[in-house]
């Protein structure tokens, strides 16, 4: 474990976005037995400027904070899971977020989690199964936490943790 002090995480919500490959009802277990929920939000560039600025500022502040705490140490910067892309000839801001579905805490107790789901009016979805038909192209908003991290073997970056989807 390292002894760095991290800057505070941010809780953010995207503007209206097109959801790409949402796995929000059942966790994706293809690459890990614990599974994880995930979604990629594709936001038109003109609507994403404020969100992009906030994420970029957090990323730069995190790198500056680590450098200030250890001026002689070199930090490998991990490519963030957000950025601008050209999709079908249109500039878009994409953001990929995920959440672990289950695991074990430090005391050995099992835990499980799932993202909160809300309908278009903001009311919680009571029957998740009714959303099973949701797939790429669905329009929604994604709430997430942007958390700075540093692992010496991996590097420094920002992880985006899924919290809720409307």
Regions found by a protein language model. Name each.
Residues 115-140, 147-158:
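Exposed beta-sheet edge/beta-hairpin loop segments within beta-rich domains
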Residues 160-166:
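Short edge-strand/loop segments of extracellular domains
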Residues 1-105:
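OB-fold ssDNA-binding interfaces and closely related basic DNA-contact patches used
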Residues 101-122:
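Short acidic, glycine/tyrosine-flanked loop/strand segments centered on an H-E-D-like triad
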Residues 43-47, 146-148, 166:
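Beta-strand elements of well-folded, non-transmembrane domains
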Residues 17-21, 72-74, 122, 139-146:
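A short linear-motif detector with a strong N-terminal bias
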